[in-house]
């Protein structure tokens, strides 16, 4: 009886090990234009972004689970169009932001925003 309980406890705890933790990149990350563009524009210099090579920045907020967030920079509603606008021209939405204008085109910002919105 004790061995059955021990086995059940081990299985239950093992199952919980996968709960919580940090969100992972979507399965399509390696094929996503948005992920490639985030790497190209060096977003990972400041941000940690799951699925983007070398995106382990610690200067700015992690973008893991960006798709679940209600606000961008704590002020701007996190919709796809607003996120794309933020990426392309952050100071137009939050004039005192520390996020620099990286020269991201509107089309590239749309692709990056779509990728980030998929991070849940």
Regions found by a protein language model. Give the residues of each.
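C-terminal motif of bacterial Sec signal peptides marking the signal peptidase cleavage site
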Residues: 15-18
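Electrostatic cytochrome c docking/interface patches
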Residues: 20-39
């Amino acid at each position: 009886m004790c061995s059955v309980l021990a086995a059940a406890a081990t299985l239950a705890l093992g199952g919980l090990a996968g709960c919580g933790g940090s969100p992972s990149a979507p399965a399509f990350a390696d094929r996503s234009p948005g992920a490639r563009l985030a790497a190209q524009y060096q977003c990972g210099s400041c941000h940690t972004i799951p699925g983007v090579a070398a995106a382990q920045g610690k200067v700015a907020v992690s973008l893991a689970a960006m798709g679940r967030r209600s606000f961008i920079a704590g002020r701007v509603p996190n919709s796809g169009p607003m996120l794309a606008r933020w990426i392309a021209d952050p100071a137009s939405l939050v004039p005192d932001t520390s996020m620099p204008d990286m020269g991201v085109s509107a089309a590239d910002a749309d692709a990056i925003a779509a990728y980030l919105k998929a991070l849940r």
